[in-house]
């Protein structure tokens, strides 16, 4: 009987913890930002597309910024620098935990960098893919 009670207590505790961790009210600002892009029509994240976006040489934006890695590190874990030699923290969320948590900054930098690198504004789907890839790094 003791083992059954212990098992029942463990299962109940696991269920409570699971419910707490998946409660939308506990979602963080990054998840809220992704939810906003989902509301604009983005589907599930495609990490491979996010990686492809980070590494692709586009040639459709400004000539001096043909790809993300022109200013950001060759890998998301590396820092980079602007064309004026100002340091840029790594894009990987594992290295820069506050990355993609401020909606105003996310909107500003996607608008500026997508226009500069790709030559157009990124779609909601591209933003979800890009953010999700960098969260995974």
Would you name each region that the model predicts?
Residues 28-62:
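Electrostatic cytochrome c docking/interface patches
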Residues 65-75, 130:
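The canonical Cys-X-X-Cys-His
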């Amino acid at each position: 009987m003791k083992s059954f009670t212990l098992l029942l207590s463990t299962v109940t505790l696991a269920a409570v913890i699971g419910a707490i961790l998946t409660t939308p009210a506990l979602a963080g600002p990054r998840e809220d930002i992704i939810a906003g892009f989902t509301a604009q029509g983005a589907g599930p994240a495609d990490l491979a597309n996010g990686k492809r976006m980070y590494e692709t040489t586009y040639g459709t934006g400004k000539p001096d910024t043909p790809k993300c890695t022109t200013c950001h590190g060759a890998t998301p874990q590396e820092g980079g620098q602007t064309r004026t030699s100002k340091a840029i923290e790594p894009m990987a969320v594992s290295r820069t935990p506050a990355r993609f948590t401020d909606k105003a900054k996310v909107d500003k930098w996607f608008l500026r960098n997508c226009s500069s690198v790709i030559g157009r504004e990124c779609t909601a789907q591209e933003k979800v893919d890009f953010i999700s890839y960098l969260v995974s790094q």
